[in-house]
Amino acid sequence: MQQLKISQMKGMIIRSFSIACMALSALSSSAQKNPFITDIYTADPSAHVWSDGRLYVYASHDIAPPRGCDLMDQYHVFSTDDMVNWKDHGEILRASQVPWGRKDGGFMWAPDCVFRKGTYYFYFPHPSGDEWNKTWKIGVATSNSPAEGFKVQGFLPDLEPMIDPCVFIDEDGLAYFYYGGGGVCKGGKLMDNMMEIDGTMQPMEGLVDFHEATWVHKRDGVYYLSYSDNNDKDGKHNQMRYATSDSPLGPWTYRGIYMDPTDSYTNHGSIVEYKGQWYSFYHNSALSHHDWLRSICVDKLFYNSDGTIQKVVQTK
């Protein structure tokens, strides 16, 4: 009888242990992990929520083996409906498909995408000549689908050679374009064709230590412009800063740093709300430990009662 009880107790312990292991496994598989894309190297995540209820991320692609930022090519799109399981929709555009692009390709840097009046507009920087830093153009590709079928339509004319396009569509339907780099950030209103500036680009006043990576979002009637700075201390680099305004083109009031440096030489982020939770997207070098083989990440973002942003906690 005693042996039977011992045997029953052992069985109960084994079953309990098995159930606990299964629960831990389920919890692990349902948890967000960073980086969330691990089969290729990705950077510069531009996150958007479209009408199908999914969150899409448009990312640049670091190609291995690394040779600086000049090899970046072949934009990819990823999507999710639960912030855990991600679908790679594959490549949507490469340098060889850009008619006016530099003959040696590469240099497909941080992109953005918006949806307006039935069309997805994909904006990307790419040089048109051998002197790449003097010949940047902001290309535009369009599609009827968020993750396939993009065709290059041309580029925005009469712009300075800058990078990091960002397009923001306000609640009234008006579209605004921003770009920058090297300490300069400018913005302007887009025409209805989404391929020309209505008027002139103007400097975004009030930003502190702007470097690049402009992103604009709106919350509770307040416009937020976030960007990377020029931090270079103790082996740490770009911090992410932000400013606010009651107008999409400023002037802006500087608010502070919302993300500390990652382990990468650069950072480039986006901020978006999905299913009632705000998220901060960014990249690091956690997979490769190499500055030019980066990986996109996401963490929750929280606001204080006064609308300021709490410092984002970077997770693994």
What are these regions, as identified by a protein language model?
Residues 1-32:
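Bacterial Sec-dependent N-terminal signal peptides
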Residues 30-316:
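Carbohydrate-active catalytic/glycan-binding domains of CAZyme proteins
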